[in-house]
Curated annotation (Swiss-Prot):
It holds the Pfam family UQ_con. One of its GO terms (biological process) is ubiquitin-dependent protein catabolic process. SUPFAM superfamilies: UBC-like. It comes from Drosophila melanogaster (Fruit fly). The active site is at C86. This is Ubiquitin-conjugating enzyme E2-18 kDa. Signal peptide: none annotated. The keyword Transport does not apply. It is an enzyme of class 2 (transferase). The lineage of its organism: Eukaryota, Metazoa, Ecdysozoa, Arthropoda, Hexapoda.
Length: 153
């Protein structure tokens, strides 16, 4: 299966790359089509914790995009209450089979660091981000401290 070969190589490349904002990326014991990892943001307000993520690859990968899910709650306009992310690079309209998982994860880090209120999954948070930015940042930081995992050393 082409997906297996490619995912094996991509996972190996990601582990070797040692991105400071992504830790413990690994595939599940049951399937190479499901990865988990820890997102460790560097910018406020999310730099007070770490967020468990899950990446699910369809059997048709790389011809179909993966799906990313936050397993840790996050106060973010581009992530809904179920943990689903609005990430243009993995939308069916924008997906290209040449896109690598590392690029997807870099886009995820970028959207966490710089929310895009113009593409919200939570319009209430997008509005707060735009209209009451200081309040949003304070609430997001408190939410992160309360709900996020401890940051790795």
């Amino acid at each position: 299966m082409a997906a297996t070969r490619r995912l094996t190589r991509e996972l190996s490349d990601l582990v070797e790359a040692k991105m400071s904002t992504l830790r413990n990326i690994e595939s599940s014991d049951e399937s190479l089509l499901m990865w988990t990892g820890l997102l460790v943001p560097e910018k406020a307000p999310y730099n007070k914790g770490a967020f468990r993520i899950e990446i699910n690859f369809p059997p048709q990968y790389p011809f179909m995009p993966p799906k990313i899910l936050f397993k840790t709650k996050i106060y973010h306009p581009n992530v809904d209450e179920k943990g689903e992310v609005c990430l243009p690079i993995i939308s069916t309209d924008n997906w290209k089979p040449t896109t690598r998982t590392e690029q997807v994860l870099q886009a995820l880090v970028a959207i966490v660091h710089n929310p895009e209120p113009e593409h919200p999954l939570r319009s209430d948070l997008a509005e707060e981000f735009v209209r009451e930015h200081k309040k949003f940042m304070k609430t997001a930081e408190e939410f992160t401290k309360k709900n996020a995992e401890k940051r790795p050393e």
